[in-house]
């Protein structure tokens, strides 16, 4: 992690942003609402129902984290744990509304720290964005010292007819 990124994270924490596990039903509702609202206009992302997240947490295979500022949820993420590795599954942030608090950076960094404290050896990002040259999400992930390991991209859309078209287009 770069010194600039760490400075942003420490500055946001000093301003009052804090990340913790989802504890109450109200926080769980805020988590689901932010996740669905963040991905509403992104047809390539499938967001499961709230019962899915509840069952993952109850089984002990995953964690739900939220970042709050003045009792407002500004970031959330869900990660799964398996065989000593943590996998960032879903994440959503209010980047534009809380620009100077860097909710994406704070949420992901605290998820990495939480996974490390639980004994996870690796932290993997499952969604690395679309396979285009200029990709802000991929650059964001690489800012944490990660390295890309995938050689191709598999598309999955929530609309079956669009899924068939994309599969046909990308098979050439």
Locate the predicted segments by residue:
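Alpha-helical elements of Rossmann-like donor-binding domains used by nucleotide-donor carbohydrate transfer enzymes
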Residues: 30, 34, 51-52, 106-110, ...
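Conserved acetyl-CoA-binding loop-helix of GNAT-fold acetyltransferases
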Residues: 99-113
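Active-site/acyl-donor-binding loops of N-acyltransferases
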Residues: 120-172
């Amino acid at each position: 992690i770069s010194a600039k990124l760490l400075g942003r994270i420490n500055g946001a924490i000093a301003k009052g942003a804090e990340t913790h596990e989802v504890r109450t039903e109200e926080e769980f509702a805020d988590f689901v609402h932010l996740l669905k609202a963040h991905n509403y206009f992104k047809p390539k992302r499938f967001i499961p129902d709230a019962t899915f997240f509840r069952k993952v947490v109850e089984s002990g295979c995953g964690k739900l984290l939220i970042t709050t500022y003045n009792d407002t949820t500004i970031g959330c993420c869900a990660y799964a744990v398996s065989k000593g590795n943590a996998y960032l599954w879903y994440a959503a942030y209010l980047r534009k509304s809380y620009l100077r608090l860097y909710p994406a950076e704070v949420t992901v960094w605290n998820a990495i720290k939480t996974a490390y404290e639980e004994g996870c050896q690796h932290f993997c990002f499952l969604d690395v964005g679309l396979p285009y040259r200029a990709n802000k999400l991929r650059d964001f992930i690489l800012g944490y010292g990660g390295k890309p390991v995938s050689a191709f991209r598999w598309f999955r859309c929530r609309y079956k007819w669009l899924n068939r078209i994309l599969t046909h287009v990308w098979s050439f």
